């Protein structure tokens, strides 16, 4: 469990670095959009750094959004594209009352899972009600959905969302990233760390083969 938690934390921080700097780079090419977004942030108080605002952003919003998007919207999306399967975090066999036989859990197909991940990410982005936040929230939502599918546990996506939002406040510590070259190198390193952390998380979620499952070559 601790290995998974560590991977999720690293994924959240690395994802924030990648998404944050890529968003800033895109806005630097669109000065009018950047000005409109800055005005929106000022008018809505999204840049508020008071204790209450930070707690709401880091703890309250991720918890509620994960319950809604990954907990409800993703489940119904998954069932819509894969009507034969049950929720991913209920991977178990169930008995039929009429004869007591065990019915295996029907696995969703790959395209159905991918479609559900994309749909919930799109809805997650739309919920932010502006195109700047919508784009990076949608991109982050793809990773959140992947983590849910990989771990099968909603608690890991809640933790991931906590870390991702907290990372936005830690970006100010990277004062040494100034030039375009610095940004490119930082994004490349963070991207590599992100991919490696996702790979390790995937490996940690693959069950080890049982002794009875191993072929007998003797």
Regions found by a protein language model. Give the residues of each.
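Membrane-interfacial alpha-helical segments at the cytosolic side of multi-pass membrane proteins
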Residues: 70-81, 170-175
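C-terminal membrane module of polytopic membrane proteins
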Residues: 28, 162-218
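Active-site His/Glu-centered metal-binding helix of metallohydrolases
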Residues: 63, 67-68, 72-73, 130, ...
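Membrane-interface starts of transmembrane alpha-helices
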Residues: 49-53, 104-120, 153-156, 178-182
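Functionally important transmembrane alpha-helices
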Residues: 121, 126, 133-189
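Alpha-helical hydrophobic membrane-insertion segments
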Residues: 2-6, 10, 14, 111-118, ...
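Juxtamembrane helix-loop-helix connectors linking adjacent transmembrane helices
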Residues: 1-64, 74-105, 109, 216
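Alpha-helical membrane-inserting segments
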Residues: 15-27, 77, 123, 127, ...
